[in-house]
């Protein structure tokens, strides 16, 4: 059975941090499913990429997926603003159950809401690192960091390393 990767996404995502990992995963034979506020709605990247949401967060069941991808940009901030905290709850399933969880740039912000970062080693874009540290994570400045089931990366320049590692984690 082909593995499925959930991608949680909102407006103002960093286009390349969505499209590049998605392409790498699909080229490796994995299915990707975009999860957002409402199925069949559209979300737009910071540079104009338009993406149709496949499954609404209210209908999404984390146990249906083999991994979670959280692209950066301002999308994670919008997702954290969900008044019901559904995206943090969704991500918590992955972190608590040792299911592969991939986050780049601002993406690790969502992981703060899982309350599962204490003692974890992560990286992220510079202006998110203090928040991760305050949540109990050990933060390093490396292109890609693997801590058990969580893979994090900093910026678009790190995408080659990030993509290689997330595909490796699922093979």
From Swiss-Prot:
Pfam families: DJ-1_PfpI (PF01965). It comes from the Bacteria. Gene3D superfamilies: 3.40.50.880. Residues 3-171 form the PfpI endopeptidase domain. Belongs to the peptidase C56 family. This is Uncharacterized protein SAR1965. It comes from Staphylococcus aureus (strain MRSA252).
């Amino acid at each position: 059975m082909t593995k499925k990767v959930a991608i949680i996404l909102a407006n103002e995502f960093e286009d390349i941090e969505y499209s590049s990992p998605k392409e790498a995963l699909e080229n490796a034979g994995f299915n990707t499913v975009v999860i957002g506020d409402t199925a069949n709605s559209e979300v737009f990247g910071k540079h104009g990429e338009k993406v149709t949401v496949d499954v609404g967060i209210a209908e999404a069941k984390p146990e249906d997926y083999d991994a979670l991808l959280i692209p950066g940009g301002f999308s994670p901030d919008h997702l954290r603003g969900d008044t019901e905290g559904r995206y943090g709850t969704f991500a918590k399933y992955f972190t608590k159950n040792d299911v592969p969880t991939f986050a780049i740039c601002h993406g690790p912000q969502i992981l703060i809401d899982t309350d599962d970062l204490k003692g974890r080693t992560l990286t992220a874009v510079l202006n998110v690192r203090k928040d991760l540290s305050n949540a109990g994570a050990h933060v390093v400045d490396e292109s890609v960091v693997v801590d058990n089931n969580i893979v994090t990366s900093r910026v678009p320049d790190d995408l080659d390393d990030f993509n290689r590692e997330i595909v490796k984690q699922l093979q």
